[in-house]
Amino acid sequence: MIQKDLILLLLICLTIISCRTPRFVYSPAPPNNPYFRERGESKLAAYYSTGADANELTNEYNNGFDLQGAYAVSDHFALTADYFKRSEKDGIYEDNRTYFDTSLVRYKRRLTSIGAGYFTPITNDRKITMNIYGGLGFGKYSFSDDGFDNGAGYHRDYSSDMTKWYIQPSINFFVGNYFRTGLISKVSWVRFNDIETSYTSAELSYLDLDRLPGRTLRFFEATWNVQVSFRNKNWFYLDGGFTFSSDPFVNDDTNLEARNFNASIGISLDLSKINRKNNEQ
């Protein structure tokens, strides 16, 4: 009898935990990973990004764009800059949660970062390079939450300033004249400040959002990036990749989560090669 009661209690606890739907505090982006080998090389890139978790039946989406630039100021050092923007929507339809039976959560994220890094070939033919970059970014994270709670409509807002800093080691491979690929890892620290919200204290505690003010969360990301160029267009690259992100590393059990996947496709230009080609002519 006692064993059956323990099993029932465990099932109830699991049900309560599983129904505590998260509010996602982080979304990954394609890393700014230049394929530099010498001074004067440049990068100007634009990407369409998606979390690949859209649902047409519930009109959910997760997409945005990324802009990136970089310039090699010497044969081993470079400067970077990038801009990130996301729009996301989650539909949550459950009637057995403590708060918010039905929710439509719409996220907005934006971040501007600058950075610097070191790159060097590690083979005599310069077909493999090692790189390490770091940077600092500032941005905004916000969402609106609309739905029904015990049959009554509700609306909540949440917004926070973000400060992000990161370190990003990578290895790039140059395969032939028109193909190159990179394996990139990234550790990011994100701090949330100046939070404004219309959630009650009990609701913030239920969603674990009361843990965010003044707290720095750490995330790990891994990316595979591919660039393809064309004959007589070696300054132009089709650029795409997949990024996987961890949830935040915390010492206690929490409902704070990250979007765990991002796919990106776009173009990358090296304007220095256009100038070099014109000078040769």
Q: What are these model-predicted stretches?
A:
Residues 19-72, 78-79, 270-272, 280-281:
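Short glycine/proline- and aromatic-enriched beta-strand/turn motifs that initiate or cap beta-hairpins
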Residues 29, 55-60, 90-99, 141-153, ...:
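Outer-membrane beta-barrel translocator domains and adjoining extracellular loop/strand segments
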Residues 38-42, 59-65, 85, 106-112, ...:
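Residues that define the transmembrane beta-barrel architecture of outer-membrane proteins
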Residues 44-46, 69, 79-81, 114-116, ...:
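Membrane-embedded beta-strand positions of outer-membrane beta-barrel proteins
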Residues 48-54, 83-89, 120, 134-142, ...:
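Transmembrane beta-strands of outer-membrane beta-barrel pores
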Residues 58-120, 135-138:
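Glycine- and aromatic-enriched membrane insertion/assembly motifs of diderm outer-membrane
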Residues 75-81, 123-129, 177-181, 191, ...:
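Repeated loop/turn-to-beta-strand initiation elements of outer-membrane beta-barrel proteins
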Residues 206, 210-281:
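Predominantly the C-terminal beta-signal and adjacent terminal strand-loop region
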